[in-house]
Amino acid sequence: MLTPAFELTQDCDFLTVAIRVPHARASEFDVYFEGVDFKFYAKPYFLRLTLPGRIVENGSEQGTYDADKGIFTIRLPKETPGQHFEGLNMLTALLAPRKSRSAKPLVEEIGASGVAEEGADDEDEEFDWEIEQTPYEEVSESTLQSQCHYGFGNLRAGVVQRLQDELSEVIDIKDPDFTPVTERRQKRLAAELAKFDPDHYLADFFEDEAVEQILKYSPWWNDAHAEMVASLGKNQEQGDSAALVSFSEEEKYQLRKFVNKSYLLDKTAHRQVYYGLVDILLAYCYEVRVTEGEHSVESAWTIRKLSPTLCWFETWTDVHEILVSFGRRVLCYPLYRHFKLVLKAYRDTIKILQLGKSAVLKCLLDVHKVFQENDPAYILNDLYISDYCVWIQKAKSKKLAALTEALKAVSLSKAQLGLELPELEAAALLVQEEEGAGRAAQCNPSHQAPHSSPEPSDSDSTSSSGTEDSASEQEEPAGTQPSLLTSLQAPLLEEDSALIIRESGLCRNMASQGCEVSQGQPLASARAPLIEELGDALKMLRVSTPHGVSAGSHGSVEDAEERGQVPCD
């Protein structure tokens, strides 16, 4: 038998079931409904649903068939008009067979008066999210090894030992079957400290343009949450928030493929399941935001790397340590490492939880799809995500709301991450200020050579014999003139970018400053002595003619300098 695609909707008085059976014979079908049971048969399709509310046969039921689309539409009257049926989009839970009220768990605690069913006695029980403290007891090594469980609700053991080759690329912990919970945490914290890169963090801290762009992205749950808040402002019922989240045909197909299960969880395991859900949602929210909803080949790596539940098989004792661990891993592993992204993912997770089970299920289905399309990561679906997708459909909305309030009550600061971020940022800002002050001092001429005084140029010192008498430099023979030129090139290149050196000659535009030097006028700039020395050196180099050359030739050189047209040899 094939399970057909179906969809349930409702109004105040009727429940509508739309069943798609494209290859069935419309003349041969059967429909049965009574109380919470609904059955439909049209060869080769069979559909059995356990409804969240009671329906009744009173003559007002209706049925139609669209031959073009192959869809049966059946309208069933509610036993209590006006009643709101919750969880109509939880298809896996609807496909589950009706439980026997007299059935008992297969495993019971000896001496206990009875094991309460999640949906019955603990319906109104206040869920305690505080840490449950117990006295310390020394535990033997053999006992520790027997407690090395993992997976959804810590129900798995021995899986990694059999799949060591496949899981080595998926998880960070080695030999989880023989690693106690305490040792897992110690190794995880040490690995995070070793992975933290201060340079990468500071680069994202100061150059945060890409991060700011990511923060502006609005995922689908923002609009749904805004609609929910608006509807609550109009005093509408909280149950209507489920209608704000819709599932695609692909997601509905995923739900129909899941195998319905019942989970026997004690109080501790039950709390661990909720805590693990928060951890997975935080990692998922980060990934959706940085990729702006378009998953990439790195999406599976990002989600599992940011979730210690998935890559370290971590278990939790309170909500705050989940948030701290997530913050540490965001600043250690992915491409964008900014504390604002941690806080944004935290607020996104709160919005998803406030939207209820439908929104959480939609996120889990997306995670399941990402892992299923990644070769090594699909094993995490078997260990965690598939069970979460089935379990969340039966979870109590009241407990999910209590978890949301517990998450809203916690706060996170950089100092709590244990990575010395405040000290690191303060040191970086101090260095940045010092570098800025140094650059400002270099750009301000008043800070350069404050004790230097401009020296007037001595044009009379140049003669046809090529000798020079200056107070700022000693006399040198003609054979040392190239070395003098070389010693003047380096500081001049640093001070004036207009200087050009060609071969062994030296050319400079002296359109303005050359005039002042030739006229004996001092320069206001601290570079005046250097320019004067350069002018004298140039004159010494240019006067390389025999003694018979007239002084007028030298004057022509000075005129060329004033026009900025000094030729180069």
Curated annotation (Swiss-Prot):
Example GO biological process: positive regulation of TORC1 signaling
Biased composition (Low complexity): 452-469
Gene3D superfamilies given in the database record: 2.60.40.790
Keyword line: Cytoplasm, Nucleus
InterPro entries: CS_dom, HSP20-like_chaperone, Shq1, SHQ1-like_CS, Shq1_C
Main location group: cytoplasm
UniProt-annotated location(s): Cytoplasm, Cytosol; Nucleus, Nucleoplasm
Residue numbers spanned by region Disordered: 439-482, 545-569
GO CC field: cytoplasm; cytosol; nucleoplasm
UniProt superkingdom: Eukaryota
Domain CS per the UniProt entry, residue ranges: 1-89
Function per UniProt: Required for the quantitative accumulation of H/ACA ribonucleoproteins (RNPs), including telomerase, probably through the stabilization of DKC1, from the time of its synthesis until its association with NOP10, NHP2, and NAF1 at the nascent H/ACA RNA.
Subunit architecture: Directly interacts with DKC1 alone, but not in the context of the core trimer composed of DKC1, NOP10 and NHP2, nor in the presence of NAF1. Does not interact with NAF1.
Similarity section: Belongs to the SHQ1 family.
Protein name, UniProt field: Protein SHQ1 homolog
Organism: Mus musculus (Mouse)
